[in-house]
């Protein structure tokens, strides 16, 4: 099923776990009929980073606030007051997740987490992949039969454990 013209809006079941400004941003997004792709281009950020701002999972720069205010026609003062604190990451969803798509991502880690860990350890040594010095993209591919496929790329700096 094509998704032409449809955009993500604020799910009322998670709204109470998000910052107050999330509703303002999503209302502005919906009123203008903008996709995260369009907003991300305006912010000069990735789609995932842009969406993370809306969910209160990323820090907004002064430039982000200026551009969001301009694009979504939301008071710069309001956004500055509400978006300049520190994000409270990881609070938007219950654990384990109950939303089906988010649960599938959780399930991927459950099923393949140790396999990822083993391969990463063999390639890089004892350490972890940073989720701070990190980027991610979401892309769409279509196979020969016309079926859509999701491509999620995770890129994180390798952080070796230090000896002490």
Curated annotation (Swiss-Prot):
* Entries under HAMAP family matching the protein: Cyanate_hydrat
Q: Which organism is it from?
A: Fusarium vanettenii (strain ATCC MYA-4622 / CBS 123669 / FGSC 9596 / NRRL 45880 / 77-13-4) (Fusarium solani subsp. pisi)
What is this protein called in UniProt? Cyanate hydratase
Ordered alphabetically, the record's keywords are: Lyase
Q: Function, please?
A: Catalyzes the reaction of cyanate with bicarbonate to produce ammonia and carbon dioxide.
| UniProt xrefs under SMART domains | Cyanate_lyase
Query: What is its EC class?
Result: lyase
Q: Where is the active site?
A: 104, 107, 130
Per the record, the GO terms for biological process are:
cyanate metabolic process
Tell me which EC number(s) this protein carries.
4.2.1.104
Family classification: Belongs to the cyanase family.
Tell me a Gene Ontology molecular-function term this record carries: DNA binding
Per the UniProt record, one Pfam family is: Cyanate_lyase
Catalytic reaction equation(s): cyanate + hydrogencarbonate + 3 H(+) = NH4(+) + 2 CO2
